């Protein structure tokens, strides 16, 4: 894409995303487009306007810039790629994913996850992410 084709796209996408958050019927927002242009959206997103939305935003990879901003804003943001449901058909067949979206399945906190340590028995230290400086 040339710079000419990108002009205004971030603002347009930000307005569209805001409209999803402002729709009281919207429960879940899945971005399946990828996040190549996520940084162009971030500067135009009116976080104050959408802060009270109950909609949950799901994204992955480059979209972590938006996930981080939404989470810091008090919105629900999940680092998840919908394509995982195509790869792991058990998520759909078991009904787990449907129950989770319907609010009938409890989300597990990080300290509730079942993990096996390959080396040692605990983790300690700061957590760093690729987008920690984005917001």
Language model regions located:
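Active-site histidine-anchored catalytic micro-motif
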Residues: 6-126, 130-131
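Short acidic-hydrophobic catalytic motif
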Residues: 134
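Short beta-strand elements in bilobed, periplasmic/extracellular small-molecule ligand-binding domains
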Residues: 1-4
